[in-house]
Amino acid sequence: MDYKEIIDNLKVSSVKELMKRLGAEAIKEDETQVIFPTVCHNGDGEEASSKLYFYKNTKMFYCYTECHAMSIFKFLKHYYEARDIEYDWVTDIYNVVMDCSNFNPNLGFAKPRFVSLRDKYGTERKQIQLPEYNRGALDTFIRRYPPEWTNDGISHAAIDKFDIRYSISQNKIIIPHKDVDGRLVGIRGRALNEWEIENVGKYMPIKLEQTWYKHPLSMNLYGIHENKENIQKRKICFVAEGEKSVLQAESFSFPNCTVATCGSAGINKYQLNILLKIPGIQEVVLCYDHEELPGENKYFYKLYENCKKYSQYVNMSFVYARNGELSLKESPFDKGEAVFTELLKRRVKVK
């Protein structure tokens, strides 16, 4: 089944059971809808209002206070992120949706599994080796220069360098993820179908036959293999949020020293250790998507604290669009080299 078929075949009883196990029992139900507390964005259930509706005809959620329309896939992402729970898309979202009524919240989350590994090995600055996938899987996909990317500052040379492919059957841009040694440790897909983008997500691991080509994003850096020599020569690394930024940077006039944490606006200790193993590195610059509304400073201090946490190991800094250079959700790379360079000159250095 595709994602739409999965959603269409959801049983209301299974959704109610899942919500109950997540600490959100139904407040009210009639023949058309079930009303739940807004646990989608309230980490504290006591602060939740009774404005999260599940509509039986569409099998979709709608949060009337903040999150708006959501499929069950999107709802789970909101739920985890509101609680700072690190999740694995396949284990904690896809598999949960496929077996709603049997979900055990004490066993289902990926955070204890991955965080314990980072803590165990990160303290001693040791790396563990992620499982490797057969590179032959990439031959399933064709080589193509997707206009969605070539019209957004990504060159043909960048697409070739990072071995970007295209899936005809899934209508997705295929993004191989390699570790620092060039081993294939995951494959992600950038959805092009609008329905899937809105109701499931834009970037997800790829499934071929019965295999999900997934990996813990928190234990790798996209682009590290392709750009490690540039990072070593220039002694600096730009850490972006998404893969697209790494490819956009390939078109700049200076060597590409960019990697991406992929979906996480912050670098963790394990990822920093990957960078610290590159000889001679002197500075790590966080270059994340713009998340601040005018007059706010919460995101500024989030970036500041992330840098401060690791400033004893290496020079840490971050770019921040103070003067409206970026719109909400835009990355520092989206506006091209001139804007990126100007933001870089005015980066915040944290000691």
Functional labels for PLM-detected ranges:
Residues T150-Q170, E226-E229:
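Short, basic/aromatic recognition patches
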Residues M1-V12, Y62, M70-F73, R234-K235, ...:
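TOPRIM fold recognition
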Residues Y87-F141:
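Conserved active-site segments centered on acidic
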Residues T38, C63, L76, W149, ...:
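Terminal peptide-recognition signature
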Residues T65-M70, A137-R143:
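Short acidic alpha-helix initiation/capping motifs at coil-to-helix transition points
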Residues P37, K111-R125, P176, D181-G189:
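Long, compositionally biased
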Residues M1-L107, N151, I168-S169:
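N-terminal structured subdomain of primase-like DNA metabolism proteins
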Residues E46-A48, I168-P279:
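Phosphate-handling DNA/RNA-contact segment within nucleic-acid enzymes
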